[in-house]
């Protein structure tokens, strides 16, 4: 096995379903922000659960710190403070562990997950900037999550232009497209990666992730990304963290109900992860419904490489 195949970083799993599993306060539309507001000890515990399972990067619990989940009034009053608190909790958990754990600041979708048709660039940029400013002092790297369109990507790039920290762009994929890797907008992964390549500068390290999509569509996205990067002779890391959901449709209403689960076992998820790694992914974790047991399976596998 060559050196590139031995390189692997373990990301954490899904915060929302983990705090729900622990019976923290959890309901729509607040989702994972409810524990942050009412019982933050559960957020500490969830981070620690993933760290103990072997996670080397943990993501701040700021995904739901947007008007879509908090409501406009609570967001205006506390959105920035909650995002800052989420980053502070993650920082504290990372610093208290005996192993090296990095904290990723989370920039989530501004208008709800999986709906590129609802994106508004001007207001989105303001929300992104608010969450960026709130977390900047506490994070080691940035992770823009569940990006569904090139329009959203471009808006995020303008926000991250002022940072010198490593930045990861995580795209959510069309769950029904197995032959062609598509963003939820219908734009191709190849188009997205070409845009990143053409717009990249040398001020900070860029990586490309794929998240919150079914595991079956990830391998093609990794292969397409690797092909574009090889064509441009670029060495950009690729990450994958899939969800444990059934397929999400294009008219999904993220606050209407909890998405149904499919209950992939740690062993089943690991089999997908091994394929992603073979195709070039070097950062692997889990999104919604992927818990500490799944992350431990990934960590144990890493130890065997």
What are these regions (language model features)?
Residues 1-305:
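Domain-level signal for soluble alpha/beta catalytic cores
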């Amino acid at each position: 096995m060559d050196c590139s195949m031995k390189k692997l970083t373990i990301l954490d799993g899904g915060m929302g379903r983990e705090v729900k599993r622990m019976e923290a306060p959890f309901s729509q539309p607040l989702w994972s922000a409810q524990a942050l507001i009412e019982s933050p000890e559960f957020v500490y515990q969830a981070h620690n659960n993933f760290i103990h399972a072997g996670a080397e990067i943990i993501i701040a619990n700021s995904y739901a710190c947007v008007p879509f989940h908090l409501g406009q009034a609570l967001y205006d009053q506390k959105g920035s403070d909650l995002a800052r608190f989420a980053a502070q909790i993650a920082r504290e958990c990372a610093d208290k562990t005996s192993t090296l754990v990095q904290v990723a600041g989370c920039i989530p979708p501004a208008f709800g997950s999986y709906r590129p048709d609802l994106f508004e660039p001007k207001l989105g940029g303001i929300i992104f900037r608010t969450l960026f400013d709130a977390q900047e002092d506490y994070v080691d790297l940035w992770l823009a999550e569940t990006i569904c369109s090139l329009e959203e990507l471009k808006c995020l790039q303008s926000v991250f232009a002022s940072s010198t920290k490593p930045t990861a762009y995580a795209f959510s994929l069309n769950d029904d497209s197995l032959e062609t890797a598509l963003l939820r907008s219908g734009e191709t992964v190849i188009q997205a990666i070409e845009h990143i390549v053409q717009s990249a500068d040398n001020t900070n390290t860029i990586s490309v992730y794929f998240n919150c999509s079914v595991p079956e569509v990830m391998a093609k996205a990794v292969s397409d990304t690797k092909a574009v990067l090889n064509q441009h002779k670029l060495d950009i890391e690729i990450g994958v963290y899939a969800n444990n959901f059934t397929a999400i449709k294009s008219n999904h209403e993220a606050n209407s109900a909890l998405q149904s689960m499919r209950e992939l076992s740690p062993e089943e998820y690991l089999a997908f992860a091994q394929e992603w790694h073979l195709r070039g992914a070097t950062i692997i974790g889990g999104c919604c419904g992927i818990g500490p047991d799944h992350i431990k399976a990934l960590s144990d596998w890493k130890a065997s490489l």
